Amino acid sequence: MKLSAIISLSVAGTVGTTAVVVPTTITLVNKTHQVEHESEQSDFQDIRFGLNSVKLPKAQPAAATRITVENGTDKLVNYKSSPQQLFLAKNALKDKLQGEFDKFLSDAKAFPALTADLQEWVDQQLFNPNQSFFDLSAPRSNFTLSSDKKASLDFIFRFTNFTESVQLLKLPEGVSVVVDSKQSFDYYVNASAQKLLVLPLSLPDYTLGLNYMFDHITLNGKVVNKFSFNPFKTNLNLAFSNVYNGVDVFEAQKNLVGKGKYLNTHVKAEDVKKDVNANIKNQFDIAKIIAELMGKALKEFGNQQEGQPLSFLKVMDKVKEDFEKLFNLVRPGLGKFVKDLIQSSSQAENKITVYKLIFDNKKTILNLLKELSIPELNSSLGLVDVLFDGITDSDGLYERLQSFKDLIVPAVKTNEKTAALSPLIEELLTQKDTYVFDLIQKHKGILTNLLKNFLADFQKSTPFMADQVAIFTELFDNEGAFDLFGEADFVDKIAELFLTKRTVKNGEKIETKDSLLVTSLKSLLGEKVAALGDLLDSYIFKNELLNRSVEVAKAEAKDTKGATDYKKEQAKALKKLFKHIGENTLSKTNLDKITLKEVKNTENVELEETETTLKVKKLDVEYKVELGNFEIKNGLIKAMLEFLPDTKDLETTLDKLLFKGESYKAMKDKYIKEGFPGYGWAKGVVPGAFESIENTFKSAIDKTKSIRDLFGDMLFGNDLSSVKETDSFITLGGSFDIKYGGENLNVLPAYYSLINSEIGYQIIGVDTTIDATKVKVELKNKEYKGKSPAINGQVKLSQSFFNVWTNMFDSITKQIFQKKYEFKDNIQVFARNEDNTSRLELDISDPEQRVIPFAFVDGFGIQLKAVDKNITKEAGNTEPKSPVIQLYEALNKEKDQKQQSKQSPKQLDTKTQLGYLLKLGDNWSKDDYKSLIDDTIINNNYLEASFNSKITVDRLGIPIDLWLFKIWPKFNLEIPMQGSLQLYSSSVIFPYGIYDTSVQDAAKIVKRLNFTDMGFKLNDPKPNFWFVGF
């Protein structure tokens, strides 16, 4: 039996009232006969597919209506200063959803769509389950929508048992009724006049659909609240683009935290104790494995025989098990994927194709994609299951993709974002036995351009990291970086990438840039070591071993006779350095000296809760890291000295260090004009005296020695040739303590980057202490033993430099390293069970638990702000400053004011400091902001270590030629060597990621902001000397 339920539309006499009336005489069709009582079939039309041609009235889905959330005060949401596309959670729109729905109801197409939903409910809930035994009619049917958009329902649906036996009638809400043969049962549906409520609906492509529901409805006498005829799909076709049917992280906090709520019921005290301790041990194990892995790899490169190229991937293949162990600690189950990835190369011993890599690790890859902060990916990840459905091996995966090749390739080519990748995609779809790193190497040109564009965008969005990002930008400025994944010799490629000047195209011009190492050093040092400027130029910035010039490279390529082969020298020095690090510094023997011991492990963790919070009542964890005389051997320092030039030009060095400084020139000019103190009458001998002093110093230079030898004298107190590489240079002994503590610490949810049912938790604002006051740093070379100093004579300058070095080392060690560091941080835990399933998992089918970690938090207004250009305009710079730099400058200004009295900068309260960063305006008093202020951490640290030493020469005899004879006056000479090492850092840690809109075209999500400034200052030496007799 089939039903033709007749719903016709009519407009009642009362103006503004629309009604739908279902006639009392409707078409009934049973197995044996058909009776038609009304000739209204002409108005019927089949508008749905697959329902056995069930005919419906002119109740139609509305044409698709999309509301795009845009920037601008006249739009639904004001994106403040960010014009690009951002993503919202539905809670950001608040009552705007209802407002847009109410406006939509005034549209002529709205009411037919409402009735279409009603008709589907009649079919699916009343007719379809009962059509085999019951006829269905509607003695009364009224659905009205008044001019003020209030809806009412008044329906009687009559079921008639047309069989010869008793039948079970199935009704909505799980109700069943027994109906005798030939008997009827009336089912009542009523709703008093009421405003229809909006019901958000999840749609693909990050779109929020709007459905509707009644606040309350009566189904056969039973009141049902929040009732929708079509809860999972609607014929309204009204939707918001770029809006997710979920909640942002701040709204989720309200839903998930508090007495009886998810986090409070699922995080137990014993979990916190176990997780915090596991977190410390895990981080320690990870650090040791990374160090040991690096040591093994560098040892392989260092022991490479000349003339036998050793590629990066061949060495990675040898240490793949270490990578597996490392990444399993980072995240259980990830290790196998990384190990397989390393083997996806034709250079690997056991090669793994791209398709086998994907097939064997599909679940891990899918989870990684989910965790990337790329909202566009999220809507298509569901297709992965379809792709793998029925596939049993990697060959099957290849054949499945082959069947889609004619669809995939054109789609890739026509998409602006993926068109450049089409050659790579085509090769991947054509060749079954291909490998990841072979593809990277072969298509390095494509990947270079993509990566350059990515880094350029990233640099725009991270102005406070401009220097660091610039290094990576320049590294991938040419295709050569991808040769690391080819068969090229790794050591040669490192020399080429990091120690060689680069030729780059800037518009129409070809420019030469410093090597990446020199670029980094210049960025780090800046103008803060002006006193050493000329020396840095000679030995670092213009050193061919660290900054091999294009001209030298060309001469080497032509094998020019007599030219120094700096490329070979670089490779030789790198291998020596790598070998020593691998065999000594990062050897397993040396690393095993460092151990972690538990002191306190939070034996009695207690959790407290209120209606809106979950707190750790008290946290008290302490671990001790014992260093066990960790050694840095002389060989490491000697290997580093190999990068200094071996030219014999110490006279030039002495000139630049002592006799070309402004202080020396000023003193010399003064004495020439005034004479020596107490000997003003003898002005005429002053120029000769200075000339003799300079000659005396220069005559003390051993002409066979280089700057390497002078550094050997200074650092080892011995001749380089006499220094044993296996002896200790520095030993690190004693221990340092790591402490986590605090009281009444908030516990909040923690999320991956994309929508994910798996979540973690974080303990906010943990007092973190690293107490290094018990660390013993011992410089082993404490006594000068050199028998053949680079600068000796009566000035004994090599020995003086050694004394300056030991004094500076002791000062910096005590003032910087042997200190107690205190700051706040969050402990974040993504706990897993033994079977690797998440211990905390939400039901993301529930929109209130579907958390959108990347949602723009409109309404909070807490995005980072761009500073007005007029405020920050400086010479040659009209760009707005990053907010974290503004914060840094404000606090640094206070630091400068305190510097004279050696006081630490005052720690401003969080609210004041956030005022530098966030667009909170007049909203500080709102309760919504209180949790943000309370749960944001700002750490500011300033450290300065000064050293004060001097070079002294007692009773230095200076020969001075007079007219008829020579005299030998004696002078005491003193050259102060003073300077300081300064470290300043500012970090801001938000409880959740928020959009940084400080750079208009490059908004991004940030959770942690860091600014670090380091400077080494060496004061211009101001020599002083005085006459002490003959």
Curated annotation (Swiss-Prot):
Keyword vocabulary terms for this entry: Membrane, Transmembrane, Transmembrane helix
GO cellular component assignments: membrane
InterPro entries the UniProt entry points to: MG075-like, P116
Location of this chain's protein in the cell: Membrane
Transmembrane annotation, as ranges: 7-29
Topology with respect to the bilayer: Single-pass membrane protein
UniProt entry tagged with the keyword Cell membrane: no
Pfam families per record: P116
UniProt keyword Transcription present: no
Name listed for the protein in its UniProt record: Uncharacterized protein MG075 homolog
